[in-house]
Amino acid sequence: MNTKQEAGNEKVTIYDIARQAGVSTTTVHKALHGQKGVSDAKRQEILLLAQNMNYARNTAAQNLARKELRIGVVAEVCNREFGSSIINGIKFALDQLKDSKLTGYFGHLENSLSRPRVLADFRDMLNSDMDAVNLFPTGPYKEYEEFNAIIEGRNIPVITINNEIPHLSCLCSIQQDGVMLGRMAGDLMNLCNPGAANAVFIGSKEVHAQNASALSFEETIAKKGGNLSSIYETQVENQIGFVLTENMLHNYPEVSGIFVGVSQCIGVIDKLKSYEIVDKYKIITVDTYPEVLELLNAGIITATLDRRPYDMGQLAVHLLYQYFNSGIIPPKRILIPPSIITASAAETFNEALYPKISLLTGGIKILPPSDTEQ
């Protein structure tokens, strides 16, 4: 029997698909919405059949008919620049989709949030009537594994942002592309300070993307005869960066290039300023908060790499919307590439005004889990 529907025929429903496939409407619904309880082979068979039958959902009618979709948001670090940009991206996307009955419910967004408070927020979100949860965690991650039973028991989709939690049952993990970040920083350093000694400041080697950026930076500068004297871990604290820069000056006086691969670069630069030697260094940083852009305009920073946290927040919401509205299951891991911001670009930079039309496809790298094992 030819399953292709001719133009002008009555609208195809899930009942038509179920009858054609010889399965229940419940099975069709699960297959179309990416829910558990359907084998991969059967799911693909139903999706192909639906496509051949020109099945199309009435999105407007669905939006009117369905209940409100409640998305919980839990952020462990929301007071700092990178975290606040993620939260702002989430809020922007929720506002875009407010007419689609998509509503965000935020946990505590305080300046100083303890690990027990974050875990309690996450537990409360999972045990409540949330349909999905966006989680922006920081390490250590072991404590999150206890939530697998709740996630799997409720079949609730969880998307982690920026950091992947090993062994946690997640729908998707959206991360910065640490390897590309380090390579781009290395290329910039090779252009402005080739063959020199360098130092790298990151938050922690335990964060996969940050450690990857340091290692790929080292590999890239080596191509032009440069070397990496040391990697410093600031724990994302300016005060620690300030102290570690003193250590660098004492132990590695030959260093003339610095890559700060974490938001908090002010501590490093303030120490160099205190000795009035900041102009002797070529400095590459990350992110685009106001203090960084001011330093960029002043010529203290050579360039900064936007890790696009705002886009990460937006993408997390849009992926959940597509998951519920169209049954599209996102890849397990999505890497967001950085973009280079120079002094000329910094004069007009505003992350909230960046065009978001190509957000879901433009430049985003999707890798199978086997290619990015930690």
Predicted regions mapped to residue ranges:
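N-terminal helix-turn-helix DNA-binding module of bacterial transcription factors
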Residues: 1-63, 67, 371-373
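An alpha-beta-alpha
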Residues: 184-231, 320, 328, 332-347
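Short, high-confidence coil segments that cap the C-terminus of an alpha-helix
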Residues: 130, 196, 252-255, 301
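Hinge/cleft segment of the Venus flytrap/periplasmic-binding protein
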Residues: 49, 219-221, 308-374
